[in-house]
Amino acid sequence: MARTILRARRFFSLILPFFFISSVYAEQTSVPAKTVTVEAKNETFAPQHPDQYLSWKATSEQSTREDALAEDPRLVILWAGYPFSRDYNKPRGHAYAVTDVRETLRTGAPKNAEDGPLPMACWSCKSPDVARLIQKDGEDGYFHGKWARGGPEIVNALGCADCHNTASDDFAKGKPALTLSRPYAERAMETIGKPFDKASRFDQQSMVCGQCHVEYYFDGKNKAVKFPWDEGTKVEDMEKYYDAIAFSDWTNPLSKTPMLKAQHPEYETWSVGIHGKNNVTCIDCHMPKVQNAEGKLYTDHKIGNPFDNFAQTCANCHTQDKASLQKVVAERKQAIHDLKIKVEDQLVHAHFEAKAAWDAGATEAEMKPILDDIRHAQWRWDLAIASHGIHMHAPDEGLRMLGGAMDKAADARTKLVRLLGSKGITHEIPLPDISTKEKAQKAIGLNMQQINAEKQDFIKTVIPQWEDQARKNGLLSQ
């Protein structure tokens, strides 16, 4: 019976159009406090929702850390001058959201609330404490200051109040009570013509995930989170927006290119894929309905690979067996990986060739069109590869973006050959040894021994202080 209901649901979802409508960007405003305080401690809701809580807690089983820089040292060069060149791991379970942002080398080793390289905004997708602080202090109050300021406050891992209105009557009655707990996400959805309160249940399910699984940047003096969707959500649309406001995340010190760093744009890429176009939501594939020991259906909150729950996910729509579908997905993943590596090789050469051109006396006017090509090439590459599931969500779009990146990188290198030739340089520009993460980091001047030592000291001394303070203030369970 359950499968019949799911198949009927899928039939009706397939006939619903999926579209985006442009609208005017709503300016950021401070959010007045609501009457009921956001409860950030996830275990508070365990007695009322035991199956959901225990399955959410099981995301702690997804504990493996995979070092993406060690797997692909080219990334170090592409992100030279940016914290991602120090440390970049593939994602793991939601239970580790706070732990991982604390322990990554990207957040530095701040000694006090005013110290460190990154802003408060870097907490924004990690914890229901973010929603609590925005409710308490407004967005301006929350975003103000350095990342370390939030250490004693943001202590509970991504959980219940991030996605559910836990103070509502509906939630108390066992209903999902989905909500957008981040006001900036709500504004972004309105920008593309999708106000949450008017959205279908299907759309709301993916919009909730889209609070975090999106491209965003840090805007203005307060470094507030904003989604760059004013022109649309495709790679070219967001590029147009960023170029119009002359935004860059950082400047690569090798090529001196003002760069863009993509985050994790699953919402944007999913929406143009076959599943998104047919209203197959994040929930359908990553949080299926399963049965508990008493035979009662509930939503599995151990978010993970759909193939791990094949009968409850893929098999609701597909007639192929698991092995057949895994083969299709593996082939798509390999195709994207192969093109990804080819693009990276071109971009690595482009950054070093641009450095050689500067060293040979190239002018800003001569370099401007080349740097534009490098910027636009790496942006397309990054948006494609930053969405780790693009081979499943939108493989055609992934290949399209990577193909565009290859074209732009080739344009940059063609112009560089001509420019270098005009400076009397006709030999191939040599690359340093970047065959390992360590060698690549040395090539861009990182003192990893010092960086790692400082981080370990921070983990041993500062984080325990944060947790002690949080417990004293009642923000963590004892």
Curated annotation (Swiss-Prot):
Note describing how the cofactor binds: Binds 1 Ca(2+) ion per monomer.
Broadest EC class assigned to this enzyme: oxidoreductase
Cleavable signal peptide: 1-26
Binding site for heme c 2: 160, 163-164, 301
UniProt-annotated binding residues for heme c 4: 282, 285-286, 393
Compartment list: Periplasm
Cofactor(s), by name: Ca(2+); heme c
EC number, as in UniProt: 1.7.2.2
Gene3D superfamilies for this protein: Butyryl-CoA Dehydrogenase, subunit A, domain 3 (1.20.140.10), Flavocytochrome C3, Chain A (1.10.1130.10)
GO biological process: anaerobic electron transport chain; nitrate assimilation
Positions of Ca(2+) binding: 215-216, 261, 263
Residues given in the record as heme binding sites: 122, 125-126
CDD domains in the record: NrfA-like
Origin: domain of life: Bacteria
Binding site for heme c 5: 275, 314, 317-318
Keywords assigned by UniProt, alphabetized: Calcium, Electron transport, Heme, Iron, Metal-binding, Oxidoreductase, Periplasm, Signal, Transport
Reactions this protein catalyses: 6 Fe(III)-[cytochrome c] + NH4(+) + 2 H2O = 6 Fe(II)-[cytochrome c] + nitrite + 8 H(+)
Database matches in InterPro entries: Cyt_c552 (IPR003321), Cyt_c_NO2Rdtase_formate-dep (IPR017570), Multihaem_cyt_sf (IPR036280)
Pathway entry: Nitrogen metabolism; nitrate reduction (assimilation)
Matches recorded under Pfam families: Cytochrom_C552
Record's function text: Catalyzes the reduction of nitrite to ammonia, consuming six electrons in the process.
HAMAP family (UniProt xref): Cytochrom_C552
NCBIfam families, per database record: cyto_c552_HCOOH, PRK11125.1
Protein family: Belongs to the cytochrome c-552 family.
Name by which UniProt lists this protein: Cytochrome c-552
Species: Citrobacter koseri (strain ATCC BAA-895 / CDC 4225-83 / SGSC4696)
